[in-house]
């Protein structure tokens, strides 16, 4: 029996941390840490539906810009999970770019970002391309038994 998940390091042991996990029979993937992901082909980057960020050091978060670049112009929702402060960090990255041409895109790219604090609460926000990635706050919720994602 083949495993349902296939994990692989994106870089060698001296490169930025990033673990790419493909799901068998589905064209979707998970990413654990978002270091340099330039070694991934675009088709693999475009499959990423969930990214889990351990902390915001540059070697764990540098790849966000390439993820963004590969997904702009596609209908996609990407769920991003990480520590406190992640919503602000993602928001700042998205605000660093000019989005004056968003009306030309028929598709909408959405980042649903959840930051988890030490007490197990998850604060969430949504950033949509159609809204020039303005932050839309979402409800804070308690995580049952520390479960971050149940898909």
Outline where the language-model segments fall.
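Binuclear metal-dependent hydrolase catalytic cores
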Residues: 1-151
